[in-house]
């Protein structure tokens, strides 16, 4: 099917990062749709307007179920462009592992991007190794939840951290929106520590592209370049002036990058 601009219509599936939800794509979604594409933005479990609480989800697989259910419902023969942001890269990878035949390419935006050799925990730990050792968490809070038998740790980003490390190139109104809508997050560290490497036949068989945000202060820019060089992609882009939230601070540039990737490899 052709889109409004005469080009082949694509179906983009947008996967948000930790603490966020489908709402964070509110600028990008209509831009892609105005080019004639179909766009689906999902809420992962305990995110956005998903009704479940964080203490009701124990594993990364459970957290990713809305994405997996969406992928399962895609008719045979149809393919999507899967777009994962930040921590959403892990959920994206899980979908690639289970439904490689339904994904034409996976695009990682300032995101963790595993390979088909090392376990996910390897890349989870690398994020912290690449981060500044003396980084000030500012008003970010660590909260305990769960039971004495199964203690869990949640992270709640504070307004100062968001405005200076995550949304620093966004407007005050956009930062306020995030403050109002962001939910506590779990990084599922215990679950990730037990997970095996993704397979070459599943995850590894899907084409990958990467978009680097060159003014990112929360997901190390150097690590983003390292992932491109060491994990490997068939296409990479750099968005100049983009903070971690490129879909909000640089939506037009992000749309252009996604369009170029789709045109080239799909």
UniProtKB/Swiss-Prot annotation:
Coiled coil: none annotated. It catalyses: 17-dehydropreakuammicine + H2O = norfluorocurarine + methanol + CO2. It is an enzyme of class 3 (hydrolase). Residues 11-121 form the AB hydrolase-1 domain. Keywords: Alkaloid metabolism, Hydrolase, Serine esterase. Hydrolase involved in the biosynthesis of curare monoterpene indole alkaloids (MIAs), natural products such as diaboline, a pharmacologically active compound used to regulate blood pressure. Curare alkaloids act as animal glycine receptor antagonists. Catalyzes the conversion of dehydropreakuammicine to norfluorocurarine. Belongs to the AB hydrolase superfamily. This is Norfluorocurarine synthase 1. The gene is NS1.
